[in-house]
Amino acid sequence: MLWNNKTSAKNTSSTDKGQVTESYAQQYLSKQGLRFIERNFHSRQGEIDLIMLDGDTYVFVEVKYRKSKGFGGAIAAISASKQNKVKHCITFYLHQNGLNEYNTPCRVDVVALEGDITQPQVTWLKNAF
């Protein structure tokens, strides 16, 4: 088990589940060699769950959790609208931090978590959109 959490999914609010799954994803990616930069970056356009570095590449991570794979599971829950919001938010982040979107290496990854919230199955999609 990557992360020990005794929280029951039944008594966990949506906000708490988001924090739990984002922590899990952050730890998972750190173990894969990525370096943590920031969590829950907000702009008027939306939110970026995690910002990590993979070498010199900025990795903007969307974390999704679903208890079951019904209705397509966690990956299918990322709509075209959500993707556009994330892309606009990335542009804002880069400009706010003095980075040029045209010559700053970056990508968008998805970490999809499914099943028991205390030991979810992890799917990591690099360059997801």
Swiss-Prot record:
GO terms for molecular function: nucleic acid binding. SUPFAM superfamilies: Restriction endonuclease-like. Signal peptide: none annotated. It comes from the Bacteria. It holds the Pfam family UPF0102. Belongs to the UPF0102 family. PANTHER family: UPF0102 PROTEIN YRAN (PTHR34039:SF1). This is UPF0102 protein CPS_4433. It comes from Colwellia psychrerythraea (strain 34H / ATCC BAA-681). The lineage of its organism: Bacteria, Pseudomonadati, Pseudomonadota, Gammaproteobacteria, Alteromonadales.
